[in-house]
């Protein structure tokens, strides 16, 4: 149990003020309405006092009660109960089983003498159902056995509206709307007097203890339960709050949210409704009354009246926060919302939320702290300032005053516990990352992002790079020094780049690759630099580092030129300048020329020739000293052959001279082909290389896109070379037969038969002859079909002509042009297929056909 000072007990009326020495009456009941305090005594007097509250300089409250009037009610018994009906200016007084109406100020009975007889106890309905503002609803326990009566009380009259029977004799009652909460002889029940429905709550023994039934809010009651428990119950018969444990012999109870105040023979105890713990105990002997009136709790003995004054709200809240009782402080603050002006409450509550947030933060309850910080709209710099050196040196931030917490910095908060420090830093990283893109960060994004960068760098966190490659507001001087301190040189380069200092960034990265400084963030940093330069829009930066990237790797380094976006290649980088730069780097030069020729397809003879020469030089370097025609073709040689075949821009004669005597027969054959020297090319392929498939491919390659006679001439040349004199005649004969049989359609069969030796059998040339015959028959039949179609078309035209000649056209001076509606002045006209006649000049100016074939008539 934790001790809390929630209330102070302040005297309001001493016996000397209440009764004179000769008076023998004792205080029996109390009522308070605003400043009006009423006391009923055992000798049937009612006293009226005016209460005045004063606050002393120290903050404590005092009360002064000024006695106004007192009146004897004319009975011999004690005044049992008093209830004020301020709307009617009436005081309801229960004495000797009768409820009388007296004026609140004069204490005079109403002239009509209206009263309610036969009552043992009564309660006012603070949630009335009648809807009449000029009356109050009163529920009484009748002297009739097991009977409850409901009355409407007006200024000068009373009216009974309902009488309800109960299962047992009622001892105490509280009312809310249509619902009665009753203490019966053996149990508590909820009774709806409108419908008669009853709900049992729990058993109660009236012989052992005094019943307590208090309405504490809308449709909720506080009851004295078994086992010394203060029980809460709703009109639905359920409890939405846990019970509080108080004394077994409680005399009275009241609620002053969030506290339950109870009175027994010796003490006043205060329990929290939030955690059900006892918070305060006040010694108070001989007390027999404890009631709350509009939030004011009054206790009384038979000789005096005292007021339980709650400590000032903010002091209570601050005391709770100082005791780290966050939930109680927040609930207490919320409960005061109705009593404080809205703007003042919002300022106060926001500050309480933030204080609570820092308490939870200090206890490492980060989720709760984060929610409180959000609700309180924390200036996140308050949190950052706890972490030494995280705020930028240029920050103008000063902590809130009065302070929101008691800590100088994180080291004091954690008492040097490095594990706690690490947890706090992880929380701040997470929190800053969440709020940096929200409205919370507006106005001090630089402080947030700079702090976040420092945390990431210190923790070697992967998100450091993500922060720097996206939009951020990291301050360069602070951030650069921090990154350098923690040897985050790659990240420092990203920071330079974000601040448009690309030269500094690249120079830093180059130093890492060269080993001048150590940073293992990226194992592929060289490739990253190449990629960075590739997309850089600063030509000077690229040229400045071109030699460095090429020296480390020609194949990778040349990408700063070859992978550059096309628009930048055309604007800031002249190919001739790049070629001049790459002369020292032959591999890179080849890659760049390949890029120009094959990817960009630049139609410039110089580039094509240069690339071919470089290919040729490399092929010659790779060739063995003794050429072997069966040697495997290298990748470079394949590229050379492909370039020689596909390009028409290189200098053929120049390359022919370079290949002459170089032992490159296939390349020479391709060059001869480019010069239309087909016999020489085929001679090389057939006689020197004996590469018959290559010879056939040559014919197909050179005849691609040309007319059929050209293609036929090439194949006839190849056949002639096969059949001509020379070495390897048998092999050439087989090749000739294969050529004819595979490409029969490419030959003129009549010419071929004249060239073939007479010793060749028909069976040998069967595929060729069949193909030739099929082609001849196909050609003849195709011609016949074409002739037939032409004749049919001609016949159709003749038929149309005869139809036109078969009908006559009569032209007279009464005929009108269907375009201009004027007569024809000469026998010259245009006739449309629909029969319409128009002037020739009208037809020339208008290309539309007349809508009607009928001749116009003069009117």
Curated annotation (Swiss-Prot):
Recorded superkingdom: Eukaryota
Subcellular locations according to the entry: Cytoplasm; Early endosome
Domain CNH residues, every copy: 24-297
GO biological process: autophagy; endosomal vesicle fusion; intracellular protein transport
Residues in CHCR repeats: 563-727
PROSITE patterns to which the protein is assigned, alphabetical: CHCR, CNH
Key words, A-Z: Cytoplasm, Endosome, Protein transport, Transport
Keyword Cell membrane attached: no
Cellular component terms (Gene Ontology): cytoplasm; early endosome; membrane
Keyword Protein transport listed: yes
InterPro entries found in the cross-reference section: Clathrin_H-chain/VPS_repeat, CNH_dom, Vam6/VPS39/TRAP1, VPS39/TGF_beta_rcpt-assoc_1, VPS39/TGFA1_Znf
Oligomeric and partner information: Interacts with TGFBR2 and ACVR2B; in the absence of ligand stimulation. Interacts with TGFBR1, ACVRL1, BMPR1A and ACVR1B; in the absence of ligand stimulation and to a less extent. Interacts with SMAD4; the interaction seems to be mutually exclusive with the interaction of SMAD4 and phosphorylated SMAD2. May interact with ALOX5. Interacts with RAB5C. Interacts with VPS8, VPS11 and VPS16. Component of the putative class C core vacuole/endosome tethering (CORVET) complex; the core of which composed of the class C Vps proteins VPS11, VPS16, VPS18 and VPS33A, is associated with VPS8 and TGFBRAP1.
Family the UniProt entry places it in: Belongs to the TRAP1 family.
PANTHER family assigned: CNH DOMAIN CONTAINING, TRANSFORMING GROWTH FACTOR-BETA RECEPTOR-ASSOCIATED PROTEIN 1
Function description: Plays a role in the TGF-beta/activin signaling pathway. It associates with inactive heteromeric TGF-beta and activin receptor complexes, mainly through the type II receptor, and is released upon activation of signaling. May recruit SMAD4 to the vicinity of the receptor complex and facilitate its interaction with receptor-regulated Smads, such as SMAD2.
Protein name: Transforming growth factor-beta receptor-associated protein 1
